[in-house]
């Protein structure tokens, strides 16, 4: 096993750990989930570049008769990238004392100001950071409003 294979295993393990945390552990942290809302995905250009580069590496490894283990590891990395970038849906998860946004826990008392833009983006101003929440379904903004009113 080469150092390349070890690095690939490390990246696959990191992506798998992130996917498991995002899918199974985060919704169970900090109490029961009151509301979980699907968000719009960010630009997919980065994901296309990542999966494309891994596909080029797979092609290069196959045509140069590289190690079969490396080809399988690259394929697993491409599948993990495909899952994380295209299948997994970003979510905002509301709990009793706060919410998870982009895998970061934010307590309700940190919200200083909230605005709704004309194009349906909820803007939350924290102490030093601004959150831009783009929901997939515009009707979910009313659900978010009700949760925030009930818990503040």
Swiss-Prot record:
Pfam families: DUF986. GO terms for cellular component: plasma membrane. The keyword Secreted does not apply. It is found in: Cell inner membrane. The keyword Cell inner membrane applies. It is a multi-pass membrane protein. Keywords: Cell inner membrane, Cell membrane, Membrane, Transmembrane, Transmembrane helix. Its main location: membrane. The chain crosses the membrane at residues 6-26, 45-65, 67-87. InterPro entries: DUF986. Belongs to the UPF0266 family. This is UPF0266 membrane protein YobD. It comes from Salmonella newport (strain SL254).
């Amino acid at each position: 096993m080469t150092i390349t294979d070890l690095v690939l295993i490390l990246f696959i393990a990191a992506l798998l750990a992130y996917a498991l945390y995002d899918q199974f552990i985060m919704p169970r942290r900090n109490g029961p989930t009151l509301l979980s809302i699907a968000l719009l995905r960010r630009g997919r250009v980065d994901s296309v570049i990542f999966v494309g580069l891994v596909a080029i590496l797979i092609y290069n490894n196959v045509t140069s008769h590289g190690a079969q283990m490396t080809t399988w590891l690259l394929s697993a990395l491409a599948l993990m990238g495909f899952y994380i970038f295209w299948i997994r849906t970003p979510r905002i998860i509301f709990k009793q004392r706060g919410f998870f946004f982009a895998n970061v826990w934010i307590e309700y008392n940190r919200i200083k100001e909230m605005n709704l833009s004309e194009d349906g983006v909820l803007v939350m101003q924290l102490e030093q950071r601004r959150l831009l929440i783009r929901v997939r379904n515009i009707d979910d903004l009313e659900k978010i409003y009700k949760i925030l009113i009930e818990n503040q």
